[in-house]
UniProtKB/Swiss-Prot annotation:
The lineage of its organism: Eukaryota, Viridiplantae, Chlorophyta, core chlorophytes, Trebouxiophyceae. GO terms for biological process: photosynthetic electron transport in photosystem II; response to herbicide. 2 of the reaction center chlorophylls (ChlD1 and ChlD2) are entirely coordinated by water. This is Photosystem II protein D1. The gene is psbA. The D1/D2 heterodimer binds P680, chlorophylls that are the primary electron donor of PSII, and subsequent electron acceptors. It shares a non-heme iron and each subunit binds pheophytin, quinone, additional chlorophylls, carotenoids and lipids. D1 provides most of the ligands for the Mn4-Ca-O5 cluster of the oxygen-evolving complex (OEC). There is also a Cl(-1) ion associated with D1 and D2, which is required for oxygen evolution. The PSII complex binds additional chlorophylls, carotenoids and specific lipids. Chlorophyll a PD1 binds at H198. The keyword GTP-binding does not apply. [CaMn4O5] cluster binds at D170, E189, H332, E333, D342, A344.
Length: 352
């Protein structure tokens, strides 16, 4: 009899736990994805803060030349970063218990791999949690779909690119100047500026910013007057009100006359779908471009593609970019190799 009561009590506790986890009445929705999201993101955030402040230098290139990225070693907020895992580790899974000591783990950049792996799991679970909450509220799933764009971008630079290049040391450093260094080296090695998927990403990000500003300014400029001159326009809106707060016909008429009639949306639903889809698709393409360049399917090479009747090269902007790429490649990882691969792998051009 006692055993039966205990089983019923435990089942009741589990049922109450399940109900609490999936309840949409909580101030913050947890969900089953949240059960994994919360510890992984807390771990990634905690280790990042500690490592950014106090972790020792890391032998990123695997040549016994540690690189400092931490505040206590003389860096500031801009120059500081969590330095990627050492090239000596490559793609090996490198938890703390795989190192001979904590000092070795820190020297080889173990915190970077710990942060990146937990962060990746956390943001994937956050996306799943968005879908889960939408499902429970009877909403459509497009919030999670939109969030998949930054998830894809983070996955590309933190997971796919290191896999393609064969080492976590090629991942993006976790810092401001480290991000810029990653971008410069990426351009030098992969010519990303000449990759069509990157161009689509630029169109998505800048186009999305433009469309967001246009939409916000049009709505703000065509608000329906509900207040006096002495009150804030924002006081004219009541949360949950049924009627429109702005005149879409006026906004449509203005924009149609400013550009041309069919440049303006006359359907609010299709307008907002467009505002969401444009940057999301652009960022998807950029993430896809990073993922293909990870395996050295690089941007277009139009170097020395224009010549005169005598066979002499007429430089184009592609050649100017190529010169910049060579200069950047010479400068990075100065002691890891003695000569840039692009210069060392071809016959030296004749100077005379």
């Amino acid at each position: 009899m006692t055993a039966i009561l205990e089983r019923r009590e435990s089942a009741s506790l589990w049922a109450r736990f399940c109900e609490w986890i999936t309840s949409t009445e909580n101030r913050l929705y947890i969900g089953w994805f949240g059960v994994l999201m919360i510890p992984t993101l807390l771990t990634a955030t905690s280790v990042f803060i500690i490592a950014f402040i106090a972790a020792p230098p890391v032998d990123i290139d695997g040549i016994r030349e540690p690189v400092s990225g931490y505040l206590l070693y003389g860096n500031n907020i801009i120059s500081g970063a969590v330095v990627p895992t050492s090239n000596a580790i490559g793609l090996h899974f490198y938890p703390i218990w795989e190192a001979a000591s904590l000092d070795e783990w820190l020297y080889n950049g173990g915190p970077y791999q710990l942060i990146v792996c937990h962060f990746f799991l956390g943001i994937c679970c956050y996306m799943g949690r968005e879908w889960e909450l939408s499902f429970r509220l009877g909403m459509r799933p497009w919030i999670a779909v939109a969030y998949s764009a930054p998830v894809a971008a983070a996955t590309a630079v933190f997971i796919i690119y290191p896999i393609g290049q064969g080492s976590f040391s090629d991942g993006m450093p976790l810092g401001i100047s480290g991000t810029f260094n990653f971008m410069i080296v990426f351009q030098a090695e992969h010519n990303i500026l000449m990759h069509p998927f990157h161009m689509l990403g630029v169109a998505g990000v800048f186009g999305g910013s433009l469309f967001s500003a246009m939409h916000g300014s049009l709505v703000t400029s065509s608000l329906i007057r509900e207040t006096t001159e002495n009150e804030s326009r924002n006081a004219g809106y009541k949360f949950g009100q049924e009627e429109e707060t702005y005149n879409i016909v006026a906004a449509h008429g203005y924009f149609g006359r400013l550009i041309f009639q069919y440049a303006s949306f006359n359907n609010s639903r299709s307008l907002h779908f467009f505002l969401a889809a444009w940057p999301v698709v652009g960022i998807w393409f950029t993430a896809l471009g990073i993922s293909t360049m990870a395996f050295n399917l690089n941007g277009f090479n139009f170097n020395q593609s224009v010549v005169d009747s005598q066979g002499r090269v007429i430089n184009t902007w592609a050649d100017i970019i190529n010169r910049a790429n060579l200069g950047m490649e010479v400068m990075h990882e100065r002691n890891a190799h003695n000569f840039p691969l692009d210069l060392a792998s071809v016959e030296a051009p004749s100077i005379a």
